């Protein structure tokens, strides 16, 4: 239960108070959000609609794309509305909800990236047993484990709810997150800050290193492969490792340190909450011929149906 709390809403300071800069940022973040949602949902629909994309790798990619779209939706709409309407306030309950959902999808993505690395290891290092090991039941179980991991990680954020907030209520950020909220609490948050480092920073650091090692092991096993298979495996691994670096490096910068609010934090947060999720569909499709062909077929069918429907209406 919250005690000594007279704060009912927070003010998200955002990036700039200059109207011209806000308009430019509004256009930029709106376009980025639209590209993110359309790109990720296109991958989800494409994988569901294409029988050729029925392997476990594409199942996990569809799940990752859905999480990316949901993750971005947790942050971007509020940011965009604030820039357009100059409404920068968020209720206390809304702030806590954003914090929880943000970390839920972020935690789920971290564990899902681990699952995807394991999937690639089995596919490349044990190809004859791949479909036996990564059967449908195992895939769903791994997905559930990733989601539970995200929930457990986000459940820790509830500790902020019980902290007293007496004022000021200005968050020097564009969204609700642990570090800026802990700085506003009217109590000593040193030990809570240390648990944030463990719950977010240390986990990101450990998993990031494990993922890099796993991709290194996979790459070292490609020596015995033919040039064609080696090229395909390298393409898949390079896509996965690129997303891992783009997502984890900013997270580590933010969370592997005591509670403090650096000017660069907002821009680093934009990178791993918005930019990475926009780039993810491009990274996974540009070097994957199967994905490109499936998307071309899907868009070709939709375009044909649209043209036929339009002609029918005109006739």
Curated annotation (Swiss-Prot):
Gene3D superfamilies: Rhodopsin 7-helix transmembrane proteins. The chain crosses the membrane at residues 24-47, 56-77, 99-118, 138-156, 193-216, 233-255, 267-286. Residues 1-23, 78-98, 157-192, 256-266 are extracellular. The keyword Membrane applies. One of its GO terms (molecular function) is G protein-coupled receptor activity. It comes from the Eukaryota. CDD domains: 7tmA_OR4A-like (cd15939). Disulfide bonds join 95-186. Glycans are attached at residue 6. It is a multi-pass membrane protein. Keywords: Cell membrane, Disulfide bond, G-protein coupled receptor, Glycoprotein, Membrane, Olfaction, Receptor, Sensory transduction, Transducer, Transmembrane, Transmembrane helix. Odorant receptor. Belongs to the G-protein coupled receptor 1 family. This is Olfactory receptor 4A5. It comes from Homo sapiens (Human). The gene is OR4A5.
